[in-house]
Amino acid sequence: MKRPIFIGITGGTGSGKSTIAKEIYRQFGEECIAMIEQDSYYKDQSHLSMDDRVKTNYDHPNAFDNNLLVSHLESLLNGHCIQKPSYDFSIHNRIEDTTKVEPKEIVIVEGILILEDPRIRELLDIKIYVDTDADVRIIRRMVRDINERGRTIESVINQYLNVVKPMHNQFTEPTKKFADIIIPEGGHNKVAIDIIVAKIKEVLGKYE
């Protein structure tokens, strides 16, 4: 198997990262793409009580097990399968279930802080930052957390103002300078997606 191409997609919470990833996935197909979500690599918190787990700052770099993520990316780069961890936000902890991920031509790494860690940056062939208005992002986050994670409106707003927004400004936004491509207007920018697809094909050609 030829060397896979690693694509990093980052941006603030609710920016449209997953939409971009899904569109790339749609255009190239599941035979060609492996998906790695940074959310799957939150640290195991089995040693903490539920009260302490609830206090976890999920938007801080220390929340992620980047050592495991880097190890898994290197394994995929070398043609080996990995067992991607699973995280259950309802219990604020990693669970025993894992997902087998096989090495593919294209590996998409998606998450709010993937460009914050230089070890991850060095593995990425194409680095994408999805830039979306803060008002749009908070609305999307509210919808997701209420519908998918059982949160209340009050808790989502409180978390956004006290954690998400300051962490975004401190850690996520500054990583924009590392991006090769910055996509305005989130995941619905068709022109930008077409450019990304063309760039992926170009890089794939270099590894043939």
From Swiss-Prot:
It comes from the Bacteria. ATP binds at G11, G12, T13, G14, S15, G16, K17, S18. One of its GO terms (cellular component) is cytoplasm. The keyword S-adenosyl-L-methionine does not apply. Keywords: ATP-binding, Cytoplasm, Kinase, Nucleotide-binding, Transferase. Its EC number is 2.7.1.48. GO terms for biological process: CTP salvage; UMP salvage. The keyword Cytoplasm applies. It catalyses: uridine + ATP = UMP + ADP + H(+); cytidine + ATP = CMP + ADP + H(+). One of its GO terms (molecular function) is uridine kinase activity. It holds the Pfam family PRK. It is found in: Cytoplasm. Pathway: Pyrimidine metabolism; CTP biosynthesis via salvage pathway; CTP from cytidine: step 1/3; Pyrimidine metabolism; UMP biosynthesis via salvage pathway; UMP from uridine: step 1/1. Its main location: cytoplasm. Belongs to the uridine kinase family. NCBIfam families: PRK05480.1, udk. This is Uridine kinase. The lineage of its organism: Bacteria, Bacillati, Bacillota, Clostridia, Eubacteriales.
